[in-house]
């Protein structure tokens, strides 16, 4: 299969401090080949979107990527990167030694939202030097496309953040299985799949997954294992014990969406914060 890529010209990389012990403020506005930066530097660089930085309190990007054992020389695929919260971190981190595929929404999608999101992401790729090494591919969970998210057996890491519930809500269990199978095909043996999503309590009714935006951790593990993965470890990095996962408008009641009905008190949901999330690390076994 073929795959498409957007590659931008790369210019000089500013020298960055090698200290990991505290947040550093730098500006890797360009991605010329040279010494790799640390993950802490990638998380704390000055080119990140301020609104995204404010969400680090709940999304814990450095701890999450460390849990997935990223290295700057790896080939990494981010699935459905949206506006680029994680791409802003991954692009400069992988610029000098690694390869970064952003597998965004399908080009031929009928969804206006998907088209707008993809168009905005493309604009960022062509206008912001921090994205100079990004190779743009596309991903569809239900029906695999003629193009790949990355060449088969090439990716060291595949990462998906808060996407799986959408695949289930729009395509059911088979869409999730199809996604996992595509990831399995793209990963190298011993490669890692990292999954973060909104967590539905195990005691809740299964049908709550249909429209709440929350899914059960045990169910995700079961489907990943059906697709050939082994669970390596789970983490509570992105847990939020304040979130009951039982809201009138599902996860969208909570920040950052705050989809609150007229007359409801938004401060109740702001006090909860962003959703309770599971963080799972799977491995593609060596045959």
Label the model's feature ranges:
Residues 91-92, 174-189:
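A short glycine-rich, Lys/Arg-flanked "PGG" loop and its adjoining helix->strand segment in the class I
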Residues 20-22:
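Bacterial signal peptide processing site
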Residues 35-71, 85, 89:
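Class I SAM-dependent methyltransferase Rossmann-like catalytic core
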Residues 101-103, 190-198:
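Conserved beta-strand signature within the Rossmann-like core of class I S-adenosyl-L-methionine
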Residues 15-18:
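C-terminal motif of bacterial Sec signal peptides marking the signal peptidase cleavage site
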Residues 73-82:
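Conserved class I S-adenosyl-L-methionine
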Residues 227, 267-287:
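C-terminal lobe and adjacent flexible extensions of AdoMet/dcAdoMet transferase-like proteins
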Residues 147-159:
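A short acidic, Gly/Pro-enriched loop at the edge of an enzyme's catalytic core
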């Amino acid at each position: 299969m073929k795959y498409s890529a957007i590659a931008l010209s790369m210019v000089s990389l500013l020298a960055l401090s090698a200290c990991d012990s505290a947040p550093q403020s730098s500006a890797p506005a360009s991605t010329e080949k040279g010494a790799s930066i640390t993950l802490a530097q990638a998380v704390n660089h000055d080119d990140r979107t301020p609104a995204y930085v404010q969400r680090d309190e709940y999304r814990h990007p450095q701890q999450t990527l460390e849990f997935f054992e990223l290295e700057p020389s790896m080939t990494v695929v981010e699935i459905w990167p949206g506006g680029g919260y994680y791409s802003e971190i991954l692009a400069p981190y992988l610029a000098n030694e690694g390869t970064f595929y952003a597998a965004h929404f399908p080009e031929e999608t009928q969804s206006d939202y998907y088209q707008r999101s993809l168009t905005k992401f493309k604009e960022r790729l062509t206008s912001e030097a921090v994205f100079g090494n990004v190779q743009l591919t596309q991903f569809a969970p239900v029906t695999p496309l003629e193009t790949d998210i990355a060449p088969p057996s090439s990716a060291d890491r595949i990462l998906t953040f808060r996407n799986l519930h959408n695949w289930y809500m729009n395509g059911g269990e088979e869409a999730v299985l199809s996604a996992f199978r595509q990831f399995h095909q793209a990963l190298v043996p011993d490669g890692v799949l990292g999954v973060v999503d909104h967590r539905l309590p195990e005691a809740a009714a299964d049908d709550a997954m249909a429209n709440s935006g929350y899914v059960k951790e045990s169910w995700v593990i079961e489907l990943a294992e059906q697709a050939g993965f082994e669970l390596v470890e789970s983490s509570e990095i992105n847990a939020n014990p304040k979130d009951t996962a039982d809201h009138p408008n599902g996860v969208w009641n909570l920040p950052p969406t705050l989809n609150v009905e007229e007359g409801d008190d938004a401060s109740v949901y702001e006090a909860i914060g962003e959703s309770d999330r599971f963080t799972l690390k799977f491995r593609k076994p060596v045959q």
